[in-house]
């Protein structure tokens, strides 16, 4: 059992500002290849960032990096490599380790070398936004070592409408408690905060809406 609690806006803001500065520098580095937009997603966009008081792992942020390559000049592995190399040029200057390449995201971590704790981390998903809230992301297939564009699961669709409904019906506080409980009970280290939050929103919406 974990012991997750919410991070205050005051604590999260300087880290968020630093990550945005890193993203701006990455945009400058890759502009000869393609451009991209960014936006915080998941708990990062809803003031629901958490950290586990029982672990040595700090809080985490999530950003979507929307790649503009409509003519498909670059393959998924080329895009991922260009982005990873650019992030690796910038992030270490701010005290972060080099990127970790996981199935859905590129992750950077700021580690306190004196006590071997992770102060905070950030997951970058490389995405393409289609119509009707449908989104693709670059997936790293670890078994065969290749990269492909894949559609996000249906659980991420129409989340904004469900969030609006929950807020209008004064269920946001209940959702926050539900999300923390799910995080505390999660034993899958590969399940990221963004997925747990999407599950929480969908489950709460279905339960209350009927």
Q: Language-model features: where?
A:
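Helical scaffold of the NTase/Pol beta-like nucleotidyltransferase catalytic core
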Residues: 1-41
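Alpha-helix boundary/N-cap detector
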Residues: 10, 14-17, 21, 74, ...
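Charge-rich, solvent-exposed alpha-helical interaction surfaces
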Residues: 18, 22-25, 82, 86, ...
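Short glycine-rich, low-complexity/disordered patches
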Residues: 26-42, 92-108, 185-201, 208-210
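Conserved catalytic core of two-metal-ion nucleotidyltransferases
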Residues: 29-33, 80-132
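Active-site nucleotide-donor binding segment shared across nucleotidyl transfer reactions
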Residues: 30-61, 65-73
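A broadly used, surface-exposed interaction patch
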Residues: 63-89
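Right-hand nucleic-acid polymerase module
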Residues: 105-106, 115-210
């Amino acid at each position: 059992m974990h012991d997750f609690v919410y991070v205050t806006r005051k604590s999260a803001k300087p880290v968020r500002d630093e990550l945005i500065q890193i993203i701006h520098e990455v945009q400058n580095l890759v502009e000869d290849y393609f451009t991209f937009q960014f936006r915080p997603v998941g708990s990062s966009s809803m003031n629901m960032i958490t950290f586990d008081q029982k672990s040595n792992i700090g809080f985490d942020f999530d950003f979507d990096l929307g790649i503009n390559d409509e003519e498909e000049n670059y393959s998924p592995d080329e895009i991922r490599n260009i982005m990873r190399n650019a992030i690796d040029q910038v992030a270490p200057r701010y005290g972060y380790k080099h990127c970790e390449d996981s199935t859905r995201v590129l992750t950077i971590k700021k580690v306190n070398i004196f006590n071997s704790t992770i102060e905070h981390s950030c997951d970058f998903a490389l995405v393409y936004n289609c119509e009707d809230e449908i989104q693709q992301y670059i997936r790293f297939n670890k078994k065969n070592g290749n990269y492909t564009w894949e559609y996000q699961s249906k659980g991420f669709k129409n989340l904004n409408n469900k969030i609006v409904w929950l807020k209008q019906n004064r269920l946001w506080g209940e959702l926050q408690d539900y999300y923390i409980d799910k995080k505390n009970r999660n034993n899958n280290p590969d399940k990221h905060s963004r997925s747990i939050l999407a599950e929480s929103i969908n489950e709460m919406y279905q339960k209350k809406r009927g």
